[in-house]
Swiss-Prot record:
The record marks 497-498 as: Breakpoint for translocation to form RET-GOLGA5 oncogene. Gene3D superfamilies: 1.20.5.1700. The chain crosses the membrane at residues 699-719. It holds the Pfam family Golgin_A5. It comes from the Eukaryota. It comes from Homo sapiens. This is Golgin subfamily A member 5. The keyword Cell membrane does not apply. The modification Dimethylated arginine is found at residue 89. Disulfide bonds: none annotated. GO terms for cellular component: cis-Golgi network; Golgi apparatus; Golgi cisterna; Golgi membrane; membrane; transport vesicle.
């Protein structure tokens, strides 16, 4: 970016220099106007001609001063227009650095404008025409009549100054950016004024010889030669000035074009600079990212260096180990024959042990299958006995309920008889009381009649005796009724006693039946206990067998790993060794045999593991069946007999593994639910087996559950619900 800053600084310096040149041109404008006013003042020139005609010294000094003035004007024009380049400064401008520096920059008057090419061509035509006409007129004026030298030189100087003034004006107008058509009209008018003034000067100079005295011919010829020489010099100088002005205008045009191009370049460079700034920002961001990536790569490089050092260390250790292995290689080669023989013996022993293990496993499987069949037969027998007992219990319960109903009916009848007996007894007591009262009243009446006298007493006695006979007869009748009632009561008592005895007998028979049933249940419980103990024993045996199988499997796997390591060592030895083709073929054949035997052992181990898993599942199913049988038989007299009709016994709904295939193959939602329950049960069984085999998993599960409960307790104890004080209905 330094080159762009330098270019911008150079462009700014160029603009400052152009402004300074325009300011110096403006400062020189007043001097040119003063010269023009002096040349146009004809009366003063005419008066001075009379005083200075014969003074050649002051006249020559005046001419030299005019020439110096023209040179100064040329220098100022050069300084104002060609101020772009540093090396193009004139000595006159260099002699006035203080003046150029002291002039302020007229920023308010200086306007940079682009000019069209036709305006520039018109300006060049005007300048060329203005250069030729004054010189021609001066020559004509000199050839006419030998006019005074001072006047002709003055007019020539004035005519030579006027184009310079016009050129200064046009340069100023071009430098300030005024319109070209107005500048051309002004230059034409000024040129016409100059022609008129030159004509007037010629006429005045032509009229002046009448008034001025005639000098000597020698002085005139000398002055005329001086004037001609001076006019020639002035013409040459004017031509050079015109050429310089044209070159300066061309330079100014070129500088203007270069300035426009520079401005376009500056604008383009500014746009490029903004783009480059954006690019630099993006590049800086990329550089930052790259520095971060480099830092990460440096860290990775450091890590890789550390790893490289570790790898070098490992390489050194590996080389040392390789040397040690190479030293051992010879020993291994020597011991190879012995190792092969030992390996063959070990392999034979291993095969023998494996055959023995297979034989023991087959025996255990056969014994387990036999035990399983016996146990299934026992279970079927127990199931049949349990069904028979259940049927007998139901019949006994029905008989007991019938007898209980009969006893209740008899008790109701006894209660009715007792109530009737009580009512009859109460009636008898009431009747006895009534009879006693009647007898007492009769006896009182008899006594009162006995105390009476005469015949009347006899009649009354006969009447009373008759009444007494009637009462006795009634008494006899009441006694007979009482005896009948007493007989009925005795009969009812005897019937009640008979019924009570029959009820007692039936209750005793029912108790005996219940006792028999309880004895049978106790026997079933004892048999179930025996079966449970036998099942526990079988479980323990199976557990021992499983542990033995697991141990044998681990030992076989460890031996297989050892054999694999030995095989790998042998392979490495075979790769490192350069044996003959026969020995290599023998080793390859042996290696193939060992790999085949290894594959066979692995397949056998997989089959054993699958058989073991199936046996575990069968054992767990038997356990669940025993649990279901124990749960169904422990209910006593209140047994659920809903499954007797189907002949399958009671099934617990929460043990889905016990469902038969016919039950699981049922169509509809019931079969789907049973299938899902059985699959969940199998998964739970497998999970339990996994946790039983691997205690580390159990520990992790326990830790996880403890942490989960702890977290839940912490959340429940530390949670505070948010209190929303907003109004209801979302207000």
């Amino acid at each position: 970016m330094s080159w762009f800053v330098d270019l911008a600084g150079k462009a700014e310096d160029l603009l400052n220099r152009v402004d300074q040149g325009a300011a110096t041109a403006l400062s020189r404008k007043d001097n040119a106007s003063n010269i023009y006013s002096k040349n146009t003042d004809y009366t003063e020139l005419h008066q001075q001609n009379t005083d200075l005609i014969y003074q050649t010294g002051p006249k020559s000094t005046y001419i030299s001063s005019a020439a110096d003035n023209i040179r100064n004007q040329k220098a100022t024009i050069l300084a104002g227009t060609a101020n772009v380049k540093v090396g193009s400064r004139t000595p006159v401008e260099a002699s006035h650095p203080v003046e150029n520096a002291s002039v302020p920059r007229p920023s308010s008057h200086f306007v940079r404008r682009k000019k069209s090419e036709p305006d520039d061509e018109l300006l060049f035509d005007f300048l060329n025409s203005s250069q030729k006409e004054p010189t021609g007129r001066v020559e004509i004026r000199k050839e006419k009549g030998k006019t005074p030298v001072f006047q002709s030189s003055q007019t020539s100087s004035v005519s030579s100054v006027n184009p310079s003034v016009t050129t200064i004006k046009t340069i100023e107008e071009n430098s300030f950016g005024s319109q070209t058509h107005e500048a051309a009209s002004n230059s034409d008018s000024s040129h016409e004024g100059q022609e008129e003034s030159s004509k007037e000067n010629v006429s005045s100079n032509a009229a002046c010889p009448d008034h001025t005295p005639t000098p000597n011919d020698d002085g005139k010829s000398h002055e005329l030669s001086n004037l001609r020489l001076e006019n020639q010099l002035l013409r040459n100088e004017v031509q050079s000035l015109n050429q310089e002005m044209a070159s300066l205008l061309q330079r100014s045009k070129e500088t203007q074009e270069e300035l426009n191009k520079a401005r376009a370049r500056v604008e383009k460079w500014n746009a490029d600079h903004s783009k480059s700034d954006r690019m630099t920002r993006g590049l800086r961001a990329q550089v930052d990212d790259l520095t971060e990536a480099v830092a990460a790569k440096d860290s990775q490089l450091a890590v890789l260096k550390v790893r490289l050092q570790e790898a070098d260390q490992l390489l050194s250790t590996r080389t040392e180990a390789l040397e040690a292995l190479q030293s051992e290689k010879s020993r291994i080669m020597q011991d190879q024959s012995e190792g092969n023989s030992l390996q063959n013996q070990a392999l034979q022993t291993f095969q023998e042990r494996l055959h023995e293990a297979d034989a023991t496993l087959k025996r255990e499987q056969e014994s387990y299958k036999q035990m399983q069949s016996e146990f299934a037969a026992r279970l079927n027998k127990v199931e049949m006995e349990r069904q028979n007992l259940a049927e007998a219990i139901t019949l006994a319960e029905r008989k007991y309920s019938d007898e209980k109903k009969r006893v209740d009916e008899l008790q109701q009848q006894v209660k009715l008889y007792k109530l009737n007996l009580e009512s009859s007894k109460q009636e008898l007591i009431d009747y006895k009381q009534k009879a006693t009262r009647i007898l007492q009243s009769k006896e009182k009446l008899i006594n009162s009649l006995k105390e009476g006298s005469g015949f009347e007493g006899l009649d009354s006695s006969t009447a009373s005796s008759m009444e007494l006979e009637e009462l006795r007869h009634e008494k006899e009748m009441q006694r007979e009724e009482i005896q009948k009632l007493m007989g009925q009561i005795h009969q009812l008592r005897s019937e009640l006693q008979d019924m009570e005895a029959q009820q007692v007998n039936e209750a005793e028979s029912a108790r005996e039946q219940l006792q028999d049933l309880h004895d049978q249940i106790a026997g079933q419980k004892a048999s179930k206990q025996e079966l449970e103990t036998e099942l526990e024993r079988l479980k323990q045996e199976f557990h021992y067998i499983e542990e033995d199988l697991y141990r044998t499997k681990n030992t076989l796997q460890s031996r297989i790993k050892d054999r694999d390591e030995e095989i790998q060592k042998l392979r490495n030895q075979l790769t490192n060794k350069t044996l003959s083709n026969s020995s290599q073929s023998e080793l390859e054949n042996r290696l193939h045999q060992l790999t085949e035997t290894l594959i066979q052992k692995q397949t056998m181990l997989e089959s054993l593991s699958t058989e073991k898993n199936s046996l575990v599942f069968q054992l767990e199913r038997l356990e669940q069946q025993m649990n279901s049988a124990s749960g169904s038989s422990s209910n006593g007299s209140s047994i659920n007999m809903s499954g007797i009709d189907n002949g399958e016994g009671t099934r617990l709904r929460n043990v889905p593994v016990l469902f038969n295939d016919t039950e699981t193959n049922l169509a509809g939602m019931y079969g789907k639910v049973r299938k899902a329950a059985s699959s969940i049960d199998q998964f739970s069984i497998r999970l339990g087996i996994f946790l039983r085999r691997y205690p580390i998993a159990r520990v992790f599960v326990i830790i996880y559950m403890a942490l989960l409960h702890l977290w839940v307790m912490i959340v429940l104890l530390t949670y505070t619900p948010e209190m929303h004080h907003d109004q209801p209905y979302g207000k």
